[in-house]
């Protein structure tokens, strides 16, 4: 039996801190292909629903608002341009000492979007009732404040 929890932006799996590992280039390169398998999606959706069964949870993912929690009180579809997402990822990886070109990141992000938008199981799409936030020109603080404001209105 596995246990997972998040504490202050860190992710733990069976008492092992795995935050950096799940954000590695290797995981990023393979996540779309793995998540396209029906058995993987079924198991993940069940686990995610179990984690959120009592409400009061903030969860992110490419199908959270359409598949995992289609009746969530607040759904936000957060996006940014491919260029900005690549720039942000580049800076994140640079801090970790990982080297990759900005152009390579743009290609990988575009390809992941294409794969996720066209997969048969749980495709990436905005829920009809989700609030669209384009964060291309926003700081992380501005994004957080915008989402918190929306959440307060939902209460």
What annotation goes with each model-predicted range?
Residues 36, 40, 101, 139:
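Conserved acidic
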């Amino acid at each position: 039996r596995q246990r997972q929890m998040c504490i202050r932006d860190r992710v733990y799996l069976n008492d092992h801190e795995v935050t950096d590992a799940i954000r590695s280039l290797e995981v990023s390169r393979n996540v779309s292909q793995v998540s396209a398998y029906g058995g993987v999606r079924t198991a993940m959706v069940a686990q995610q629903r179990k984690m959120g069964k009592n409400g009061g949870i903030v969860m992110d993912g490419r199908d959270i608002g359409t598949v995992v929690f289609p009746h969530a009180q607040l759904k936000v579809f957060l996006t940014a341009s491919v260029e900005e997402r690549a720039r942000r990822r580049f800076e994140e990886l640079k801090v970790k000492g990982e080297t990759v070109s900005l152009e390579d990141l743009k290609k990988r992000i575009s390809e992941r979007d294409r794969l996720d938008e066209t997969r048969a199981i749980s495709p990436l799409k905005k829920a009809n009732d989700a609030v669209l936030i384009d964060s291309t020109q926003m700081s992380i603080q501005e994004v957080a404040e915008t989402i918190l404001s929306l959440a307060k209105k939902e209460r």
